[in-house]
Amino acid sequence: MIKITLKDGKVMEFEEGIKISDIAMKISPALYKKALAAKIDGETVDLMTELHKDSSLEILTFEDEMGKWALRHTGSHMLAQAVKRLYPEVKLAIGPAIDTGFYYDFEADFTFTPEMLEKIEAEIKKIIKENHKLERFELPREEAIKLMKEKNEDYKVELIEDLPEGEVISFYKQGDFTDLCAGPHVPSTGKVKSVKLLSLAGAYWRGDENNKMLQRIYGTAFTKKSELDEYLNMIEEAKKRDHRKLGKELDLFSIHEEGPGFPFFHPKGMIVRNILESFWREEHTKAGYQEIRTPLILNEALWHQSGHWDHYKENMYFTNIDDDDYAIKPMNCPGGILVYKNSMHSYRDLPLRLSELGIVHRHELSGALHGLMRVRCFTQDDAHLYMTKEQIKEEVVGIIKLIDKFYKLFGFEYFVELSTRPEDSMGSDEDWEIATNGLREALDSIGKEYRVNEGDGAFYGPKIDFHLKDCIGRTWQCGTIQLDFQMPERFDLSYIGADGEKHRPVMVHRTIYGSVERFIGILIEQYAGAFPTWLAPVQVKLMNITDSQYDYLKKVEEALKENNIRVEIDTRNEKIGYKIREAQLQKVPYMLILGDKEVEAGKVAVRSRKDGDLGAISLEEFIEKIKNEIKNKTN
């Protein structure tokens, strides 16, 4: 008999060799029906996996991220199966699950069309009804190559040949279709209830523009049609809110072919950016942080010492200065560590909180670039805190409260994830246990709900990730708190303790916005470009009906500017209705309309983006109203 420990801590005994699907049935028929995959000792596996030793087990459903992933991974195989049925000459490349669905890359001597997608989707629905079992099998490397050559699948052969000699290669078979794959998958194609093919795109093989351009078909999959319908509605809403579209319409930023992945911020975009950064600085000063600035370019040796070389080398940019090799920083932490190391510290100096709005560069493949969301150059709102082990809990609680304050201000709900030690990690088991428990205790002490994401920590320590939920239900990972025992060791950091001896500090890496650029992109989409008054690039649009109000308009403009209200004037010889519509399209919070009546009464006619016509009031009254709104940062 073997002992299986369930997620809730309950221990059950079973015969050795039992399949996970059978355990799911014994736990609950309802769970068996919903089950898609499972985690055994933290590793995601198929439900048909047999268990031969004591293990921890978590049954995954569509409510779990890896459950979704397994279902959508199967969706990609069904897409490939449908394409091969309809167009046997097409060659298969790769087809993974992604955050919102799946895709598959194909080589074809024709171009897929939207009409062909409808035909392929109909074939997928047949495959769902056929309810094929997904069967995993393994072959030695040479036999795997032979199988794929027989099927004329050149890309699969290349993938296998890149694997080490002696590697056992896994495949999945469903009906008449077999694909090279590590899995996991759901038990049968019938588990995938609703599929929608969404779009077509080009994609270079292996993301390398020197390779052949393939055709990529994107799709998504759900266990219920209602969930699919909800997702499709969200996509339509997301198109309206696309920050790339709104960024252009509102003149906030642009991206040019001379610098793909390097955003250009326009004057209005800089207003938003500067407000966010000023607010960030104010709140950090209140919370006891000290701001630093570290260089963009640092000697390559520093990145070897920090360990980033082994993990980030492929995503770094390099240069040579005076015959020595340098790197453009992909992260701020090694530079911040040098600032700490520059002085001797006492236990009385700790915790030391150093913050930095530091520009970093990371190489992203051209196909992955996406407006402000995925760029090659961005500003990371970093802070690095140095403390004793006894201060971990209190400091992490303080960070969580600060992050909470920021996200609530912008109207975001969020959920928290505690990510534990990955396979590719540095440090001792003891340090990892202390670090993970420190984060867990901080979350528990303030009653913050969280989920555990096994094996997804940083290479130097466990972390808490904050996932924002926007107004249309999408999630964005922004803030993070990462506990680190490794960097202080690598850089020989120390402080003098109460005993007069040197001690090693604990280091915490922390962000709130994550990337300032990305956070601006998220805010554009969250607000659909209609920023709250305190954040709006233009807070008031001032417009006259005829030229006779021009002098009064200039006086009003001057009064608004004296009160630090961001105002633009529209004195064009256009109908007032046209001017109002244009201001509305520009998402300006307030319009002040000046006609002869307003001039005579010394008032302004106020139109609110949110509430419509507010009538005529004195300029002093309006200034007081808008200043209160700005001061209170009303959303």
Curated annotation (Swiss-Prot):
Cellular location(s): Cytoplasm
GO CC terms, sorted: cytoplasm
Cofactor detail note: Binds 1 zinc ion per subunit.
Question: Which top EC class applies here?
Answer: ligase
Q: Give the principal location in a single coarse category.
A: cytoplasm
The role this protein plays is:
Catalyzes the attachment of threonine to tRNA(Thr) in a two-step reaction: L-threonine is first activated by ATP to form Thr-AMP and then transferred to the acceptor end of tRNA(Thr). Also edits incorrectly charged L-seryl-tRNA(Thr).
Q: What is this protein called?
A: Threonine--tRNA ligase
